[in-house]
Amino acid sequence: NIIEVTFRTAAAAGAIESIANAFPEMLVGAGTVVTQEQAKIAIDSGSKFGLAPGTDSETIGYFKSHDIPFIPGIMTPSDIQAAIKLGCEHLKFFPAGAAGGPKLLKAMAAPYANLSVKFCPTGGVSLDNMNEYLSIPEVFAIGGSWLATKAQIANKDWSAITAQVKEALAEAAQA
C-alpha cells in the first residue's frame, strides 16, 4: 500500500493529491524531490514521504520540519556519511545499476551496518536482479520504473501494469 509519484512531470502534485484522496489507506510519497519548492508542493499535495536522487540539506530540513520522512539519494560512502550527519538513516542508492549494482551496495553498506543505515536501490533495478538487491540485509525496499512504463501509462494499459506488479511480488516472495 505504498506508492511513489516522481516529480518528473508537472502532473506529479495533482497525481499525489488524487491518489491520496481516492485511496486514504495508501501511503503516497513524492519522488525525485530536488528543491525545497518541490518539497513544499509535495507536502501540500498530501505526500507522506519524499525521496531524492541526491542529498540536499534544505530539502531534508523542509521535510523534517513537517515531521515527514525523507530518503535522500546516495552513490558513495561520502554521500552516506553526509546523509547520516543530516539525521537520515534510510537512503536511496541511485543510480544503482550504473553505480555498480548489488556488489557495490553490499560493499558500501558494510561499514555502516552498526548505524542502522538502510537502503532503497533504484535506477537499474529490474525483475531479473531485484532479488539480488532484496537479499542484502540493509535493503528495506527497491524501486523500479519497469513496473509501469510511460507507454503503458499513456495507453492506460492497467492490465499490463497489474500483471507486472503481480510478477514482481511473486518474485520478491522468493527473496
List PLM regions with ranges.
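Short helix-capping segments at alpha-helix termini
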Residues: 21-26, 112-116, 175
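C-terminal helical cap(s) of enzyme catalytic domains, especially alpha/beta-barrels
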Residues: 63-69, 151-175
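Catalytic cores of alpha/beta
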Residues: 35-45, 78-87, 109-110, 125-141
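Glycine-rich phosphate-binding active-site loops on the catalytic face of alpha/beta enzymes
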Residues: 49-59, 92-101, 138-161
